[in-house]
């Protein structure tokens, strides 16, 4: 089922839109920004105001996406420069494809992975992980599959610097 997006902004939109001159991908995302339904899945009490000011995603397809399906989920996500995404996990398996910027992925049982554009990181179901963005922040395509598609990630510990 198709669901017409209802435009919903996030505090980071002006930052994303200002990146339009950095390349075609940024320009395309900046053009979509005012028409997309941006989502944040945490509260200020959970992650702090700084995190919320520098984070958000668009669900392309999935239980709450533009294209509604229970088979899988796809997001385009933005995490700002130097942002730390605290330890969290979710039942669904997850793959990140870094589109722009850099991110240090640290996951339980895996060696740390510092990835740039084209880098891919897989997280198993229930695997706790953190992310630390590089100096440019990160745009990524994030894919979920398996059980727990409609659930949000849950934090395992309070953020280090909220």
List where the protein language model places each region.
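Conserved hydrophobic/aromatic beta-strand scaffold that supports enzyme active sites
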Residues: 57, 74-78, 95, 112, ...
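Short acidic-glycine-tyrosine-enriched beta hairpin
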Residues: 71, 109-128
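A short, N-terminal "cap"/entry segment at the start of jelly-roll beta-barrel domains
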Residues: 1-70
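A short beta-strand-loop-beta hairpin characteristic of the jelly-roll/cupin
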Residues: 86-89, 93-117
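Non-catalytic C-terminal accessory modules of carbohydrate-active enzymes
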Residues: 157-161
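A short hydrophobic beta-strand segment most commonly corresponding to one strand
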Residues: 95-97, 122, 135-155
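A short beta-loop-beta micro-motif enriched in histidine and acidic residues
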Residues: 66-73, 81-95
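Short beta-strand His + acidic residue motifs that chelate non-heme Fe in jelly-roll/DSBH
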Residues: 85-88, 105-106, 123, 128-134
